[in-house]
């Protein structure tokens, strides 16, 4: 399956008032990250893989709903100029509630606050994520 790569074109900022429900995970929070993976039906991540991700500059955030880690996204620092909003995932029973948008926006703001070019990608048949990407203000790179 082909992917579509998007680049962010700054068009202003949308303010949301829920920053306390989304936060970055520290390197010491692998257990919490693995809890989210299990809720998504994925295998837990080994400790050495988690630390390697952080060493390479990948940082995860989680969106909590009533204390449950229901959505995640990360920033992948591919270069000194461009960072990517990546690995956006929402627990199936919590989808279609705006959580993918909110967790992606959290990462996007971090990237822009650091003066980097923001990118994001998704599968060409993932129409739900394409709508999120469009709402965030990204345009496809053709």
Q: Where does each model-flagged region fall?
A:
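A short beta-loop-alpha structural element at the N-terminal edge
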Residues: 21-33
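Conserved active-site alpha-helix within GNAT-family acetyltransferase domains
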Residues: 101, 124-141
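A conserved beta-strand-loop-helix scaffold within acyl/acetyltransferase catalytic domains
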Residues: 48-91
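Conserved GNAT acetyl-CoA-binding A-motif
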Residues: 111-123
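Conserved glycine-rich acetyl-CoA-binding loop
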Residues: 87, 91-102, 125-127
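A conserved short alpha-helix in the GNAT/GCN5 acetyltransferase fold that borders
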Residues: 95, 104-112, 134
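Acyl-donor-binding surface of acyltransferase catalytic domains
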Residues: 1-20
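Helix-loop element at the rim of GNAT/NAT acetyltransferase active sites that forms part
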Residues: 31, 35-45
């Amino acid at each position: 399956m082909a992917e579509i790569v998007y680049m962010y074109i700054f068009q202003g900022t949308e303010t949301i008032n829920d920053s306390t429900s989304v936060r970055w995970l520290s390197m010491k929070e692998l257990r919490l990250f693995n809890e989210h993976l299990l809720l998504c039906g994925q295998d837990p991540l080994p400790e050495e893989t988690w630390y390697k991700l952080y060493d390479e500059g990948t940082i995860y955030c989680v969106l909590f709903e009533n204390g449950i880690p229901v959505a995640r996204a990360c920033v992948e620092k591919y270069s000194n100029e461009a960072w990517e909003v990546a690995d956006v995932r929402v627990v199936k029973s919590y989808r279609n509630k705006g959580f993918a948008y909110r967790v992606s926006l959290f990462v996007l703001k971090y990237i822009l606050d650091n003066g980097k070019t923001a990118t994001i990608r998704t599968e060409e048949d993932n129409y739900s994520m394409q709508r999120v990407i469009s709402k965030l203000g990204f345009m496809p790179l053709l």
